[in-house]
């Protein structure tokens, strides 16, 4: 495909004249969707609606403050909930997980990988394409590519000494990140300007990016002509009503047999490839979370009455 030049925007850009943005040759935008307090970005509604009206391709990003897998999951569920309810005719650039905040800097590479992978699991299970945004130094210091599943990277690496850079200017390729094999987008400046001022915020400056590859915004699902239900046995819930990760240490035979049934069901339902060992460990908990996401249940990794009901109704 031809390389595309796109911008990313948020409330900091304030009111944007999207007609002018399109007129000056911008190929699309990635729009901030939620804030730290989990409310929508104050300009999200206005920005995406203008893109839809004018036929400007767009996607969304979430600047994450997550330091746990659970937080990453719940935040990305919210992102997908918002997207599910709005018009997406020109939604072409998917969902991006922006991880660069200092709150994650003290976490291990393993924990950061778990957070990213959890976010990806939620987004893709909801039918959207997923990518990760971060800065070049953050990528080098905090990301272990061998532990992160994502193959779509959006990396920021800026020129030094540029206070303003014209939208039409061609960036110096020597600054392009070279150690990211799966580079999808390069953010090359935070000081981009159009031929005339097109926004009332951030001094009229924008982040400018080059999109190198096609990035379908939604996951293509296979069409099936006949739904199939599970023919195996379902587990019986324990007295407290759910299975949870903390019970992975249990050795009671009857409990392990029930968890084996659950693992067999998850292998059938979502292809989780779990070892049917009867232990409710981290992998089983993650598989339950994926199943809950597919069924649009609360994601907590606990297999309880609502999850069991969904399992009995589940078909593929």
Predicted segments, located by residue:
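Substrate-binding cleft of extracellular glycoside hydrolase catalytic domains
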Residues: 1-127
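Functionally critical loop-and-helix segments that line ligand-binding/catalytic clefts
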Residues: 1-11, 19, 148-231
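Acidic, Ser/Thr/Pro/Gly-enriched interdomain connector segments
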Residues: 10-12, 223-278
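Catalytic domains of cell-wall/extracellular-matrix polysaccharide-remodeling enzymes
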Residues: 91-169, 173
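Short capping motifs at secondary-structure boundaries
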Residues: 234, 266-271, 291-297, 316
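Conserved hydrophobic/aromatic packing and binding residues within compact polymer-binding modules
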Residues: 288
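Intrinsically disordered, low-complexity Ser/Thr-rich linker and spacer segments
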Residues: 310-316
């Amino acid at each position: 495909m031809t390389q595309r030049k796109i911008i990313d925007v948020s409330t900091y850009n304030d009111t944007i004249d999207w007609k002018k943005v399109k007129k000056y040759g911008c190929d699309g935008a990635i729009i901030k969707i939620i804030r730290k307090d989990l409310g929508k970005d104050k300009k999200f509604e206005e920005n995406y609606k203008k893109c839809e009206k004018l036929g400007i391709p767009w996607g969304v990003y979430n600047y994450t403050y997550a330091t746990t897998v659970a937080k990453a999951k719940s935040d990305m569920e919210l992102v997908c909930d918002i997207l599910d309810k709005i018009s997406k005719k020109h939604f072409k650039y998917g969902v991006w997980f922006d991880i660069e905040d200092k709150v994650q800097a003290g976490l291990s590479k393993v924990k950061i990988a778990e957070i990213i992978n959890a976010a990806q699991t939620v987004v893709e299970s909801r039918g959207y394409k997923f990518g990760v945004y971060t800065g070049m130094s953050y990528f080098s210091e905090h990301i272990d590519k061998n532990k992160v599943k994502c193959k779509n990277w959006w990396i920021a690496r800026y020129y030094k000494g540029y206070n303003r850079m014209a939208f039409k200017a061609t960036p110096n390729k020597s600054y392009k990140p070279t150690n990211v094999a799966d580079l999808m987008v390069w953010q090359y400046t935070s000081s981009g300007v159009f031929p005339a001022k097109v926004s009332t915020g951030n001094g009229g400056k924008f982040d400018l990016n080059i999109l190198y590859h096609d990035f379908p915004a939604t996951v293509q699902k296979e069409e099936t002509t006949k739904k199939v239900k599970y023919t195996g046995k379902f587990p019986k819930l324990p007295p407290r009503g759910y299975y949870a990760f903390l019970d992975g240490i249990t050795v009671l035979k009857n409990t392990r047999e029930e968890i084996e049934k659950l693992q067999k069901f998850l292998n059938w339902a979502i292809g989780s490839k779990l070892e049917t060992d009867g232990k409710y460990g981290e992998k089983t908990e993650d598989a339950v979370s994926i199943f809950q996401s597919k069924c649009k249940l609360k994601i907590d990794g606990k297999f309880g009455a609502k999850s069991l009901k969904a399992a009995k109704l589940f078909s593929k």
